[in-house]
Amino acid sequence: MKTLIIAEKPSVGRDIARVLGCKQKGDGFLHSDEYIISWAIGHLVSLKEPDDYDPALKKWKMHDLPIIPTEMGLRALPKTTKQLNLLKKMLTSKEVSQIICATDSGREGELIFRYIYQWANCKKPVKRLWISSLTDAAITDGLAKMKDGREYDNLFASARCRAEADWLVGMNATRAYTIKCGELLPMGRVQTPTLAIIVNRHHEIAAFVPEKYWEVKATFVTENGEAYTGMYFASAHDTHTGQMETVGDAALGVPLVNDDMTGNGTPRAASPTKTAGIHLADAETRIPSETIAKEIAAKVKDAPGKVESIETEEKRQLPPQLFDLTELQRECNRVLGFSAQKTLTIAQALYETHKMITYPRTDSRYLSGDMAPKLKPILESAPAPYDALAASLLAMPTLPTGSRIINDAKVTDHHAIIPTGSKKPLSALSADEKAVYDRIMRNFLAVFHPAYVYDVTTIITIAVEERFRSRGKTDRKLGWKAVYSHEKNQKNDKAEKDSEDVVLPPLIQNQPVTATDTEVLHKKTQPPKPYTEATLLSAMEHAGRFVEDEALKEALKQSGLGTPATRANMIEKLISSEYIKRNKKSLIPTEKGIRLIGIVPPEMRQPETTGKWERGLSRIAAGELDDTKFMDSIRRYVTYLVGEAGKV
């Protein structure tokens, strides 16, 4: 008797076969005296189409909606029927006594296997291989730790409910609104609220009315001829308070809610640097009147002044955390200009083909405790140009692995993306593959480095009772930034953006200076920026920010809109459906996309719906919710959607 192992893809099947010594080749499988190893090619089985239930449903008619089958059936995908029939033959073979499910370790991988198993009407016992890397060591370890397949029944129930709910909502909503509007309008649980996020930003930009403001910059020169610049700011000592009741966005008719106030307009607790009792917020440099700005500039020009105060504050910036897929996609979009889909495709190749990184479709940024002994060997195998950085870490008495790196409570189906320690030469990679591998390797190296430490020096200069602020930044310890020192634009430069970064000469308090020049800067408030793929991925991941209900906010905090593995495809689907288009790095809604969001009911375009679903699916996976109750609620929702479409 033999054990049948079913992988998700041929390449994974061949990796497992290599470890188990299965060298005999068949048509669509490998085998030995003990094992038969075959594979799916992604999904081989899908849910039936409406016309599979009733041929009359091939034509889209409003009176046929909603389409809610009593029991959802399966159909073979035509392009892969040959492989499906082979697997069915193997699953039902008397030669096979046990099955090992070796599809991807996650909800979708579980669904792929279970649909094939169900299609073949197989009842044989199943073991589950659950791994996060395709190295020989990881596969061997996984085979030794397999669990009974029944332990994943709840995961399958969650996956099946997700697939059936997506089918019911997508199929019925798409047909209903397409029929009513006379143009093809694909819709979906994740697709439509994602489109709404982009459309809402478009409306915010269109409705934005820029407000003018002015700033005054002065050049100060010491008695030794050393020059530096400073920006005028309003303060408690300001002589113009009678004319400028407030300075900043609020004075310009725009509530200052992003940085210095809470969402309800209440001022936040003071956090800016204080000097001589003065709060130094960026908004205080804004002057709402050109006349006042010119008066200040004229008054200060050529006037004597002095350095009123000097304050140096040490700041620290922690290293980045390890990548999950979404963060890797954001990074590659920001640094390399890659689309989310391109990054996913390359990461998948680095995982499957080259075996150089761990499973990429993860939503965790942490490692499990059992990974700790494997970290030094990975560093020891780091190729040039990373070997010198790795050597400095290996020289430490112990590798720092705090809770920001190793945290069992925050590891989901798979741990964060890290290198595997493969000895494969970088020359085997394409240029794009090298670029993505570089981001992953440097991220892995950076997390073990200490914080980046720097000083921010704030100087207040006073001239004829007007105050000017100058800031400069000085590196003290590069820490993790040394990993990125070769890059012109440093990674994650929030620290730099927090300062004005002028070059400051050596100065002492009360040192006399002269304002040799002043300049009035004409500026205006800026609208929100269109989404890029990087910022849209963030919005999808943190969709709970758009939700008020705390329970739903928490559900979306855990899952967001879509999954790391599906978000890239969702962006591409919105583009192919002609709902959005790329404009350089920006994602812009089309008229068609704007039109759709204008007619669908709020429940279809708001993330709350997905929050409810994801909370339900998570409870099903945890064994806390009956899947029948979940599907009953979906059927009621579909009936409501069709009714709302009829009102358009």
Short names for language-model regions:
Residues 2-4, 26, 80, 91, ...:
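Basic, low-complexity terminal or inter-domain segments flanking catalytic cores
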Residues 72-79, 85, 94, 134-220, ...:
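C-terminal or mid-to-C-terminal helical accessory/interaction module adjacent to the motor/catalytic core
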Residues 276-321:
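Metal- or metallocofactor-binding catalytic centers and their adjacent structured scaffolds
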Residues 180-186, 198-247, 261, 274-289, ...:
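C-terminal helical "lid" subdomain and adjoining coupling/linker elements of P-loop NTPases
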